[in-house]
């Protein structure tokens, strides 16, 4: 009788959860695109995804910042689809929805637990904005079955603050991009003219939730916000503006990860300045500016491509 009662309660919870999820996805405004399409009816908005969860990869990932991957690896789940259309995207097939496998929320919960069993330092949700209701459901299920490692929300920064509030209490670490301080570049390269404003609002909400960065004895982040910025060739001015804005607004409340891993994966016909890597001079110019600002909490990269990089704490560069 006790087992039946538990099962009945779980079924009730699942029904209520599914009703709430359907209500959100039936008029989708999870991200700033505010498409208002009915994804429960199989329709898709800007992200290209309907209600069914689709993932491209789930595995231990060793290429994040040291406090995220460490030596154990981050339990990364790469979700298919994206609310940005960056012309330089290195994961284009995943972003436009051509790659991946449809799974249930229950299977997603199992994947979280399997990654924990592999000794993942955390669960790393990569580009999951358009699946937040389903992710929350999967996390609820996984936590009931023993999930207890930190959860990382890894995103492009183009977020709706009201949607982020749904993640309060579920996400321990936020890992957003802050790509552009200049809206002109946001329009050109990612088709999102309001990116600077939305990304700043998003980081504010993330910091509100996580508070000051916290680390365990092994150096893994337990709680906090790391903001990433990828330097683009020919656009160091934008990078300087980003660093100044982030440091002035948040100071030591966040870590800033300055990345030089931009790699042209296909030839740009319209934006030819993107057909090369960032030069050493460009990268050092941005790093020097970071030190001029007094940024200490952060990381920079050694290496010149997305695959050949390692992270170093900013203080080690002095």
Where are these regions (language model features)?
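Generic structural signal for well-ordered alpha-helices
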Residues: 112, 136-139, 164, 203, ...
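Non-cysteine beta-strand/loop elements that form the S-adenosyl-L-methionine
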Residues: 171-182, 255-261
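Conserved Radical SAM active-site core
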Residues: 47-173, 182-183
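Flexible, acidic/Gly-rich N-terminal and inter-domain linker regions that tether
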Residues: 1-74, 84
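Conserved small/polar residues in nucleotide/adenosyl-binding loops
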Residues: 312-318
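Active-site beta-loop-alpha junctions enriched in small/polar residues
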Residues: 128-130, 156-158, 230-232, 259-263, ...
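Short glycine-enriched, charge-decorated loop/helix-capping segments at active-site entrances
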Residues: 93-99, 188-193, 270-277
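Conserved strand-turn element in the central/C-terminal portion of the radical SAM core barrel
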Residues: 190-192, 203-238, 242, 260-261, ...
């Amino acid at each position: 009788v006790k087992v039946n009662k538990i099962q009945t309660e779980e079924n009730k919870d699942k029904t209520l959860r599914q009703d709430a999820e359907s209500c959100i996805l039936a008029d989708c405004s999870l991200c700033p695109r505010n498409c208002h399409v009915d994804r429960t009816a199989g329709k898709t908005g800007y992200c290209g995804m309907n209600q069914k969860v689709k993932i491209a990869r789930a595995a231990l990932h060793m290429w994040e910042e040291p406090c995220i991957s460490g030596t154990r690896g981050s339990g990364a789940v790469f979700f298919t689809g994206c609310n940005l259309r960056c012309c330089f995207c290195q994961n284009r097939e995943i972003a436009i929805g051509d790659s991946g496998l449809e799974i249930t929320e229950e299977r997603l919960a199992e994947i979280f637990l399997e990654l924990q069993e592999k000794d993942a330092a955390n669960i790393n949700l990569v580009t999951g904005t358009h699946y937040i209701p389903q992710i929350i459901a999967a996390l609820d299920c996984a936590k009931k079955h023993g999930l207890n490692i930190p959860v990382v929300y890894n995103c492009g920064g183009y977020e709706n603050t009201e949607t982020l509030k749904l993640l309060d209490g579920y996400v321990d670490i936020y890992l957003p991009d802050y790509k552009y301080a200049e809206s002109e570049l946001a329009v050109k390269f990612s088709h999102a003219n309001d990116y600077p404003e939305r990304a700043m609002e998003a980081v504010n909400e993330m910091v509100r939730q996580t508070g000051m960065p916290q680390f365990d004895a092994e150096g893994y982040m337990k709680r906090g916000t790391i903001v990433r910025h990828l330097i683009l060739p020919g656009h160091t001015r934008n990078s300087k503006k980003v660093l100044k804005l982030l440091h002035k607004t948040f100071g030591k409340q966040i870590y800033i990860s300055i990345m030089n891993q931009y790699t042209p994966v296909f030839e740009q016909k319209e934006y030819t300045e993107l057909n090369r890597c960032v030069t050493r001079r460009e990268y050092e110019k941005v790093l020097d500016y970071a030190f001029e600002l007094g940024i200490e909490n952060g990381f920079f990269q050694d290496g010149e491509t997305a695959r050949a990089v390692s992270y170093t704490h900013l203080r080690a560069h002095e």
